[in-house]
Curated annotation (Swiss-Prot):
Organism field: Acidovorax sp. (strain JS42)
Sorted UniProt keywords: Cytoplasm, Glycosyltransferase, Purine salvage, Transferase
Name the record gives this protein: Adenine phosphoribosyltransferase
Keyword Hydrolase: no
Protein's job: Catalyzes a salvage reaction resulting in the formation of AMP, that is energically less costly than de novo synthesis.
Amino acid sequence: MTALSVNDYLRQHIRTVPDWPAPGVQFRDITPLLQNPKVFRVLIDAFVHRYMDRALRPDVVAGLDARGFILGAVVAYELNVGFVPIRKKGKLPFTTVEETYELEYGSATVELHADAVQPGDRVLLIDDLIATGGTMMAGKKLLEKLGATVMEGAAIVDLPELGGSERLRASGLPLYTLVDFSGH
């Protein structure tokens, strides 16, 4: 038996759910990655080992609602840096800044506590998946409103056919993803 790359190993543990949430959609379910402690460790270590490098080490990790919280909090803990949640509108109790972005049908708004980061902070922005890139772009804009620098965006899964990773890179945001899936 040959050794698997981390990417291939993780890919084997991502469940594809056909026709969910709508006909024709291939939903990439990351919950099996989280359920198995060995697989979860490999997943977290893949991010932690990258960001332990001094040149890539963030001051803060920001996680996007909601699965970005799971990844971001653990990665921040392992790197011994702070974690800040970027939430859907109306979920944070203190003074916030907000950013609205377009969805396929309508729009959504995310927000961040106004004191979540300091000017000049280097932030790693993390989520589970990049599809259209709208949520990550909104998170980047929020952090920049507060004077932080988003040094990189990270996700487990990239769905390149939906164009999000290309749009994010075109905006100047470097990306690190672990598993690319064609098709959506």
